[in-house]
Regions:
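An amphipathic, hydrophobic-aromatic interaction surface with interspersed Lys/Arg
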Residues: 1-209
Length: 209
């Protein structure tokens, strides 16, 4: 039923709205990707949200096996999220293949964890993967991002103009957390993103009292 629904051109817009991505990206989906999304969208019937990656590992030539973030982005370093989310929002506005490769390279890490130098080094290797696989990963992240925004509504207000100032706003958040403690800047960058979101939520609530 889902396949029949999303295969109609008129429903591209509906799927784009549900995923919060441009309709032109949805139109490029293959039937296989639609099928995978049907599995992901099974949460509609269960009234649940997608909070984990379907593709948990990527085998990259000369780079080994890379791993997706944990479900609910648990233990994902805040700075990794800043990079990933910035690339994702940029790709949603201007879907360049280079941006897509950066998104996936920063999203998937070795077993040892995220490292910016490693992520940058893997971009060229990610380029060799099938573009449809990379786009499916981007779509999956979009679903997880939707789950995150609903979990932390004060951090992600629905009517904010996030597309225009998204990258700078995350850097502002990071700078506010670090404050004058510049010597420990790297330590703050490693704080789990969910802990940062809880901290921001707490501060917003305190500011409203």
């Amino acid at each position: 039923q889902f396949l029949a629904l999303t295969s109609r051109p008129d429903d591209h817009e509906l799927l784009a709205v549900m995923l919060d991505i441009p309709k032109r990206i949805v139109k490029r989906l293959s039937l296989l990707q639609i099928h995978e999304l049907a599995n992901l969208f099974d949460f509609i019937k269960r009234d649940q949200k997608v909070s984990s990656f379907s593709l948990t590992t990527l085998r990259i030539p000369s780079a080994g096996i890379l791993h997706s973030p944990n479900p609910k982005l648990q233990e994902m370093p805040f700075m990794q999220f800043v990079y990933v989310d910035t690339f994702y929002m940029s790709y949603a506005v201007d879907p360049r293949f280079e941006t897509l490769c950066k998104l996936v390279s920063y999203l998937y890490s070795p077993k040892t964890g995220f490292n910016k130098i490693t992520a940058d080094a893997n971009i060229d290797k990610i380029r060799k993967l099938d573009k449809k696989t990379l786009e499916a990963i981007s779509l999956n992240y979009g679903l997880i991002r939707k789950w995150i925004t609903e979990r932390y509504p004060l951090v992600f207000p629905k009517h904010s103009n996030t597309r225009k100032s998204h990258d700078s706003s995350w850097l502002d958040v990071f700078d506010n957390i670090v404050g004058d403690d510049l010597k420990d800047r790297d330590k703050y960058a490693e704080v789990p993103v969910n802990a940062v979101f809880r901290f921001i939520t707490k501060k917003i609530k305190e500011g409203r009292k």
